[in-house]
Amino acid sequence: MDYLDKYKFSCDNPEEFGIDIKKYKKQNVLDESHISDLLSHSIRITKDILPKVSKSINRVFEKLEIENQFNFFVTADSFQANAACSLISLSSKPDIILTSKLIELLSAKELEFVIGHEVAHYVYQHAMYPNYQNEENRNLKLNILNLSRAAEISCDRIGFLACGD
């Protein structure tokens, strides 16, 4: 993963904002239940079921020069275009969930950006970062929001790598 580390935004580090992530360990219970619910209404993406999406997934991992260690799912959602990466999994692999609306709306390149972005959340272990909604201290809440923005910049950089020529 060293190859992708050079693209990580310099502020994508909890210490930059005085945040001790050990204090927040396993705080993402709400997120985990949401992901579990999504997965219960999802199907695994395979080359037989969604060949174009499967091809985009393969291109992303070729461009990022990393092994595909993920489970990919599509969940039925005709209203919301969204994607998520989960560290909790039905197997030993992390899960990336794409909504059917997202797949419907995006071109192959745009989908590759989103997949790369979600892969980066896993690579950079952003699920370990605290959720600002669980913080009462206003200054710490603002710092967590700033950390979240920095994390999104890191993931967008990988997204651009994933969809670039």
Where are these regions (language model features)?
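Catalytic Zn2+-binding segment of zinc metalloproteases
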Residues: 109, 118-134
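Metalloprotease/metallohydrolase-associated module, dominated by Zn2+-dependent proteases
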Residues: 141-165
